[in-house]
Amino acid sequence: MAPEPTANGESEIFATALRAHLSETRFAFTGLTGKEATRSITRAVAEWSMASGWRTRCEAPMRYIDPPRLQTGGCRGYWSPPWCAYLDLRLRRKDGPPIAVEIDRSDDSTAVDKLRDEALRGRPALWIRWHGALRAEVPAGVARLHLPTRSSTSPVRYSRAPVTDTASITLGADVTPEARAEALNRDQQRKAEEKRAAARPQAPGPIRC
């Protein structure tokens, strides 16, 4: 019997399948703002998900594996990072764990942390980077699909030629069984800490200083 693909292998498989879909549909755009370009890519990924028979959820809530810390700022406390974060897309399959997707114009985002934690949980994780230099290291278990664009100025607009099957895919290292076991243990500790935090008395409202 063939072994079941690991999350690492599935990330690569799905990145390759998404690239093939974008190539077959000749995905492209011209003269879009940054937000419009991101929405265009998001729609294309959602269409691929639907064609694959999956359910798509936008702005899907997720939790970081490590608990946030209670910080104090001015006259009130706050959790950093917040307890809840959001994935750009979560693609739900009937035959496997959901696929986490982040879509970013640059490396300056929380995508690396979110996708790293999803991969450590054994879930396929895709990072779609569509503009700018690639400087961030791809986390273990994550596949990055690069869709470079051209930009114009005054005003800034982005254009993307039709995707081909040569679009670059970069893979992170394999998630080792030891790393996954340690992450799952920390995840359980985080859940317990979150319950304790929820049971604490609510802090009073802002204090005028």
Give each language-model segment a name.
Residues 2-46:
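Nuclease catalytic cores
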Residues 27-95:
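Active-site metal-binding core of divalent-cation-utilizing nuclease and nuclease-like domains
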Residues 69-72, 113-116, 159-160:
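Surface-exposed beta-strand edges and their flanking turn/coil or helix-capping segments
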Residues 72, 91-93, 128, 173, ...:
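Generic detector of low-complexity/intrinsically disordered segments
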Residues 84-86, 97-150:
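Catalytic cores of nucleic-acid endonucleases
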Residues 130-209:
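Domain-level recognition of nuclease-like catalytic cores that cleave nucleotide substrates
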